[in-house]
Swiss-Prot record:
Main subcellular localisation: membrane
Record protein name field: Dimethylnonatriene synthase
Organism: Arabidopsis thaliana (Mouse-ear cress)
SUPFAM superfamilies cross-referenced by the UniProt entry: Cytochrome P450
Entry's family note: Belongs to the cytochrome P450 family.
Amino acid sequence: MTFLFSTLQLSLFSLALVIFGYIFLRKQLSRCEVDSSTIPEPLGALPLFGHLHLLRGKKLLCKKLAAMSQKHGPIFSLKLGFYRLVVASDPKTVKDCFTTNDLATATRPNIAFGRYVGYNNASLTLAPYGDYWRELRKIVTVHLFSNHSIEMLGHIRSSEVNTLIKHLYKGNGGTSIVKIDMLFEFLTFNIILRKMVGKRIGFGEVNSDEWRYKEALKHCEYLAVIPMIGDVIPWLGWLDFAKNSQMKRLFKELDSVNTKWLHEHLKKRSRNEKDQERTIMDLLLDILPEDIVISGHVRDVIVKATILALTLTGSDSTSITLTWAVSLLLNNPAALEAAQEEIDNSVGKGRWIEESDIQNLKYLQAIVKETHRLYPPAPLTGIREAREDCFVGGYRVEKGTRLLVNIWKLHRDPKIWPDPKTFKPERFMEDKSQCEKSNFEYIPFGSGRRSCPGVNLGLRVVHFVLARLLQGFELHKVSDEPLDMAEGPGLALPKINPVEVVVMPRLDPKLYSLL
């Protein structure tokens, strides 16, 4: 009897063990199924704040996110306050973002920078997706940055580049040392500002309205990437008091100058006066009726917000690209020599290179592409927000989730780019597929509806300035040490340290006198 009882106990225990094991296994499998549809994320999320503490420190955000990608994969998420941020950094996931889900993720979150500096989100780059953004984007792409419009303003580019060359020549043809990054800064600002409102400043000029505008824009470049508590935990926005005050002061400075320029244009129009150079502000005033109101934004606000957005995104990014390109060439003299040899063989030394010659300079184009690969104009895309539930990289992304692409990581992925940290323009000549944007391996200006509308203009300026500089001058470092290539914080990944260059004319003096 005892034996039977013990046997029954053992059988019941075994049955219970089997049932428990079955239930446990089902739960584990169910958990695995849930986890397989959940985007990976780092451990250590804090109550309320989530992963915000992981973004602290001096290390650049693009590099912090790249390190997380190495650990968690090409798509991962961070819990930031009340919101979830999805970060993508491989071609397949990026393609999902910018093709299949381009419309679903086309809007922008409502952030402090857009409210305080972007004319309450009237700026093209920060406006939410909707009727207003679509109408403004159409105006900008069709009327301001079409190939015809860019061609019509070619004389401005030529004039400003000539001014730079004459400044470098110094009139005596001797060797001189210049801070080339500062000269690029003034050059590109003048090109953009003349296109926008017909204004310019001299090299080194200070205290004018135009100079104040330029300096305020530089501060904006930095403030735009500073994390704000209120952007992820709205009811703690009061903690951003100091930063918000900075933004408001900057906006007051920018808007006062913008308003002055607008009034000057309106006054000339009322008198039927015409400037020699037709500006983008003129075009906007032609297109937009005086009484127009789109999504609560009146004409004057739309005009000023557009001028600010295009100047902010177009000036510094171009000068920074030129600075990186020259720095890379100085550290790689063989590439510099090859570029000059190509120019000499294609154009010669008897005339100045023109924009129409650039199409024949394949190595120069490769230098610009490689510069954009290593130092993209924006290392991170602007943050998007999902307008509806969608699937990205095989994972479900809920409405309201924020997304960005780490272009810096994408462009340095060793699975895509052999020896990714090395400056090698030849890679764009050896493998044509590397520069095909449709591959989503190389997207220096972003992609989709929210990509940079001024990409063609920016590329023209970079190629033309670099070609003229290399044609007209021998360039050398001031010492035998390699240039420090440390990047700083900002929208456009600026170079931290200035670049001093020894310049020496390499053409017939008569050519410089013709400019």
